[in-house]
């Protein structure tokens, strides 16, 4: 990928922000596992490294360690997990303990493996590289990592990888569930960009059309390849990987996660926190996000069709009801995020004046639920609640109360100002 070209296009950006990112090299290609050592050496990546992987990711990356050794890298230090499915603070500390006397960390894998290395590298000020093994989520180029503390999902400040390497031979053979999860994470960008634009309209939140377009171009590329996602197809796997990387870079360029996520991510977080607090595996990130996206796309189109006129008022949230939906461990964070709450910044008269434009944006920039479901099914994505093991009760509470987990303007968060219930629009 030509990263400099991306930055050059954003020079003197009309949004007024100086756009930059820390990632220096992204190499996505067929059979480049054997060239990994050469790529890292050319990039100036330090030679004394810690390799972090699990048994599955190390197995599919045959030849990687040999390539590194041939290029003069010391790979004697390794942390190999049995099967890494979820990132925990204890694992971050394990990486930190072993990385203390090396100069760089190489994560071999995706998702949680990347996250624990991203945080540890940041906290120890070590160089960080990702050798990706599946196009499963959009966080490869992110400078934050998810964390759950007291059953509440927030983000760690972390480190963008200096180098990202992905061999399309490996990506194409990744488990279908992981490839489909990556597609599910990408379609969420429709709502991320929509709600970013709405926040700009209603409360003057910073918005950059050029950065948004980077995400939308990546999204369009992914959608054009929907029917190839589940195939052992290197071209589509590489293109989707590139789109996922661009989505992460867009977050760094914008200085926020708006280009990549909207209400659908927070709904997914609500479901995830509920399950983890009860010791239940919450499913892959992109799998949940895809289902939440489909639900909200249908709801938002119904809102735009049915609520042609609105009379917004000051926020009518029943706070006792909201607080009752969160556990004793979660409550302090919920209270903090809503003191003040985001709707304190919304002028009802301005919301009314903007409503026609909000409805237009929904209708013109977001595909219909029918079209989106068609794309997702072609890509092998989960589309139903039973696919992600979410009960009807958890579904409803997640949709009604997720927005209180963030200080962020979302369509779902302004529903109390409109005297409406999101559940009235899901069908």
Spell out what each predicted region is:
Residues 2-15, 303-427:
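C-terminal charged capping/lid subdomain of soluble metabolic enzymes
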Residues 113-126, 271:
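Short Gly/Thr/Asp-enriched flexible loops that form oxyanion-binding sites at enzyme active sites
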